[in-house]
From Swiss-Prot:
Record keyword Nucleus present: yes
Chain's role: Component of SCF(ASK-cullin-F-box) E3 ubiquitin ligase complexes, which may mediate the ubiquitination and subsequent proteasomal degradation of target proteins.
GO aspect biological process, one term: protein ubiquitination
Compartments in which it is found: Nucleus
Assigned GO CC terms: nucleus
Organism of this sequence: Arabidopsis thaliana
Ranges for domain F-box: 29-75
Pathway membership: Protein modification; protein ubiquitination
This protein's UniProt keywords: Nucleus, Ubl conjugation pathway
Protein name as it appears in the record: F-box protein PP2-B1
């Protein structure tokens, strides 16, 4: 397909070589353009949505073929008809595709959100907080279920105060696109712009196939500026800095906690397997939890048929609060 788009990108700035390459490209484009439209559509349908948009610029006849329902139905998920309103039946398949790419659809009683990646047509999901297993999530003293207008879902989970932080989720491999590398993110924000207890102590994230050893990493919900780190290292609401060294020496477990914090700080400074948050265009933040691959058989290489995701901090005993979790997002890994 490269020959359709123009001359040799490695050629010099001018001269006979460039003209020769352009002539070859035009000739080959003309030959492709001379094919019957349904034949052109068949070829394009085996590429990607991005490629279809690119080749549409070759000529009017190729554009017509590239925008045909034959092409865009191949890019749509097989279950698309159940995901769109009946009022959308008059739309072309390309318009339906773009609608699913630009606007996510709530599925499974509003507990999941579905859309397709515009460039590839790959399936994407967000598991709402209601779909996750949150330890103490049904105890109002620890977690509160609230409504926020900027969320995709009816309810999100607000962390009030816990020392045992554990969130888990699962998704079936069959719901995702085959032959695809996926990345997993937790989507969150902080209550009143601030959380407590997540600055010095990392959270352990795990992603893997059920029944297999998960790939783990340390993640932070806070960006990690020095002022925030020094102000909010808490144990039961008491700043660690307020506890004397002599007092800690009489309680070895507190010394271990401090050593773990210093080790994590060293990892963060060295840029090791520690990941921080990034802001999203929708006003939320996200942290990457891990990656996995769905093979061409629609499952893991070991035959597993379900992905499990975990986010935990249960070792240090420090109190944590102020986090609002919208859900866990699973989308194709971005290629560079």
């Amino acid at each position: 397909m490269e020959q359709i788009h123009g001359g040799d990108s490695n050629s010099g700035g001018g001269g006979g070589g460039s003209s020769r390459n352009d002539e070859i490209s035009v000739t080959r484009a003309s030959r492709f353009d001379a094919l019957p439209e349904d034949c052109i559509s068949k070829v394009i349908s085996h590429t990607s949505p991005r490629d279809a948009c690119v080749v549409a610029s070759v000529s009017k006849s190729v554009k017509s073929a590239a925008q045909s329902d034959l092409v865009w139905e191949m890019f749509l998920p097989s279950e698309y008809s159940s995901l769109v309103l009946q009022s959308a039946n008059h739309l072309s398949k390309k318009e339906i595709f773009l609608s699913l790419a630009d606007n996510s659809v709530l599925v499974e009683n509003g507990k999941k959100s579905f859309w397709v990646e515009k460039a590839s047509g790959k399936k994407c999901y967000m598991l709402s907080a209601m779909e996750l297993t949150i330890i103490w999530g049904d105890s109002p003293a620890y977690w509160k279920w609230i409504t926020v207008p900027e969320s995709k879902f009816e309810k999100v989970a607000e962390l009030r105060n816990v020392c045992w932080f554990e969130v888990r989720g699962k998704i079936s491999c069959g719901m995702l696109s085959k032959g695809t590398h996926y990345s997993v993110y937790v989507v969150f924000k902080t209550a009143n712009g601030r959380s407590y207890g997540f600055d010095l102590v990392p959270v352990e994230a795990g992603v893997g196939f059920v029944g297999k050893v998960a790939t783990k990493k340390s993640v932070y919900f806070e960006s990690g500026n020095a002022d925030s780190r020094s102000a909010t290292s808490h144990y039961s609401g008491i700043s660690y800095a307020m506890v004397s060294r002599a007092f800690r020496m009489r309680r070895p477990w507190m010394q271990v906690q401090r050593e773990e914090e210093e080790e994590v700080e060293g990892e963060r400074e060295r840029g090791m397997n520690v990941v921080g948050p990034k802001e999203r265009v929708d006003g939320w933040s996200e942290v990457e939890l891990g990656k996995f691959y769905i093979n061409n058989g629609g499952c893991g290489d070991d035959g597993s048929d379900e992905i499990e995701i975990s986010i935990m901090e249960t070792q240090n005993g420090n109190w944590k609060s102020g986090l609002i979790i919208q859900g866990i997002e699973i989308r194709p890994e971005r290629s560079n």
